[in-house]
Amino acid sequence: MGTISKTDLKQQIKDGIIVSCQALPGEPLYREEGGIMPLLVKAAQEAGAVGIRANSVRDIKEIKEVTTLPIIGIIKRDYPPQEPFITATMREVDELAALDIEVIALDCTKRERYDGLDIVDFIKQIKEKYPEQLFMADISTFEEGLTAYEAGIDFIGTTLSGYTSYSRQEEGPDIELVDRLCRAGIDVIAEGKIHYPDQVKIIHDLGVAGIVVGGAITRPKEIAERFISALHK
């Protein structure tokens, strides 16, 4: 498990960008044999990224070979019919904890979980099992963020705003949610639908602990689609 202190990590990631480097099966940059994500990480590091968010044991192992930047790790694994799929059970937490990464991120929404646990009970379990590990809650509403933070989660990520049926549906980042969480004294890592540099500046000035940008940097198909669609508006 990661051994960095929360204070030290906050110092490392403040005033910078954490770049999410992920590709899922069916996406252009996904290869069964791997090897692509470390290249994206190298590019992000050369650009000045202060951290990396990555998915899967394989990708994280490969990424750790090319960078010493702090890593926020997740495992995306479906558990139908339940909706949560980002580090959704103790199985994924165990797999990530074995990788010695700085932060483990997990779904902390109020949606029904595959393991049947209340999210507060699950947080209690992972904190007891891995007391030195830093955790990030991926949430979609203020109430979810507050619940996770009060339960002991270190960082609250706005990752899932717009991706749950009951959260705010917007084209861009949920800046209002970020602002409200920051005003509540919560350590926020803003993430989700951050497409443009000017949005990053606005979010930074709200007082966040960190900012994650993914698709706008590391998903070339998504980037190309944004340019192409602009021609037809």
Swiss-Prot record:
Q: Does the keyword Isomerase apply?
A: yes
Q: What would be one Gene Ontology cellular-component term for the protein?
A: cytosol
What name appears for this protein in its UniProt entry? Putative N-acetylmannosamine-6-phosphate 2-epimerase
Q: Which Pfam families match?
A: NanE (PF04131)
* Cross-referenced PANTHER family: N-ACETYLMANNOSAMINE-6-PHOSPHATE 2-EPIMERASE-RELATED
User: What chemistry does it catalyse, as a reaction equation?
Assistant: an N-acyl-D-glucosamine 6-phosphate = an N-acyl-D-mannosamine 6-phosphate
- Per the UniProt entry, the disulfide pairs are none
Native organism is Streptococcus suis (strain 05ZYH33)
What's in the keyword line of the UniProt record? Carbohydrate metabolism, Isomerase
